[in-house]
A protein has these predicted regions:
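Amphipathic alpha-helical segments
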Residues: 56-71
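Vicinal oxygen chelate
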Residues: 1-49, 75-124
C-alpha cells in the first residue's frame, strides 16, 4: 500500500511538503498504472535539488529538518537521491520554490515563472 502526509506552507513554510511511503518504491501508485512506460530520460534523468527561498532560510531549514528527520547542514537537507536547499528570499515573491536542479543530457540554465532551472550535465 501507500500512505502520504501533506503539510501546507502555512504549517511548515516555503512549499507544500509531501512525505510519502510505499511498500514497493518501484510500483509508485500515485502515478497510476503503467507509468514506467511513459518515462523518457533522453533529456532529463532526475531532479537532484530543489531550492526554497525564505525570509529566514535557517529557521525554515530547521523546521523541515525536524519534520523530515534529516540533518540540516548549512541550510541544506540531503535526501536519499536529492537535496533541499534553503536560500534568502531576494526577488520580492516571498517564500516558495525558487530553483530546481536537474541532471540532464546537456547543461544550461533558464527561468520559468520566476523559478530558476539549472540543467547539470550527466557527463554522457
Amino acid at each position: 500500500g501507500v500512505t502520504g502526509l501533506h503539510l501546507h506552507p502555512s504549517d511548515i513554510g516555503g512549499a507544500i511538503l509531501s512525505v510519502d511511503r510505499t511498500d514497493d518504491w518501484d510500483a509508485w501508485p500515485w502515478a497510476g498504472p503503467g507509468w514506467r512506460d511513459h518515462i523518457h530520460t533522453g533529456v532529463v534523468q532526475r531532479i537532484s535539488a530543489v531550492e526554497v527561498q525564505a525570509e529566514s532560510p535557517l529557521a525554515m531549514a530547521e523546521r523541515w529538518s525536524e519534520v523530515l528527520g534529516r540533518q540540516n547542514t548549512d541550510r541544506s537537507i540531503v535526501l536519499d537521491d536529492a537535496e533541499i536547499r534553503f536560500v534568502e528570499a531576494t526577488d520580492g515573491r516571498g517564500e516558495g520554490v525558487s530553483g530546481l536542479e536537474l541532471v540532464a543530457a546537456q547543461s544550461g540554465d533558464f527561468e520559468i515563472c520566476g523559478v530558476r532551472v539549472s540543467l547539470i550535465s550527466d557527463g554522457g
